[in-house]
Amino acid sequence: MPALILPLVDAATHWPERGGLVGLDLGTKTIGVAVSNPDRRLATGVETIQRKAFKQDAARLLAIAAERKVVGFVLGLPINMDGSEGPRAQSTRAFARNLANLTTLPIGLWDERLSTAAVERELIGMDVSRAKRAEVIDEHAAIFILQGALDRLANLRTGNG
């Protein structure tokens, strides 16, 4: 049976109380990957996958999930500023559907609006060279996406969200 694909808050009801999550920033050429610790407080970068064919990309993601013993995925969904979904969001949903056919780990979709831009500004502020930014931007965007999702889930648990 394929994995569930749900908005983050709904997906969280299908994840065990503890267990890490894999966060993904899906680009056309790369996939930024981050993971959380088991109590879901902190996101850290893992790697940037150079996209090849879906099966190869998915195999690497599933290997990371197995190595880290995670309980689900958080996939950044690129929503337009007006709240609509354009071609990138549709492509992300298609990727999620294809990944869901290969795993039972629930997939939570999280609004990633402006995540890459925010990370780019942060890296520029840290005086990271353009070449180095290009190497790390997607992994850092995955960290940003996953940490935002973790913070939202923490706020819901404490009644602040």
From Swiss-Prot:
| Tagged with keyword Nuclease | yes
Question: Which residue windows are transmembrane per the record?
Answer: none
NCBIfam families reported in the protein's UniProt record: RNAse_H_YqgF (TIGR00250)
Q: Name one GO molecular function term.
A: nuclease activity
Which cell locations does it reside in?
Answer: Cytoplasm
| Lineage summary | Bacteria, Pseudomonadati, Pseudomonadota, Alphaproteobacteria, Hyphomicrobiales
Its name, as the record gives it, is: Putative pre-16S rRNA nuclease
Q: Which family does it belong to?
A: Belongs to the YqgF nuclease family.
Q: What superkingdom heads the lineage?
A: Bacteria
Q: Which UniProt keywords apply?
A: Cytoplasm, Hydrolase, Nuclease, Ribosome biogenesis
Supply the SMART domains for this chain: YqgFc
Q: What class of enzyme is it?
A: hydrolase
According to its UniProt entry, this protein's organism is Bradyrhizobium diazoefficiens (strain JCM 10833 / BCRC 13528 / IAM 13628 / NBRC 14792 / USDA 110)
Q: Which GO terms describe its cellular component?
A: cytoplasm
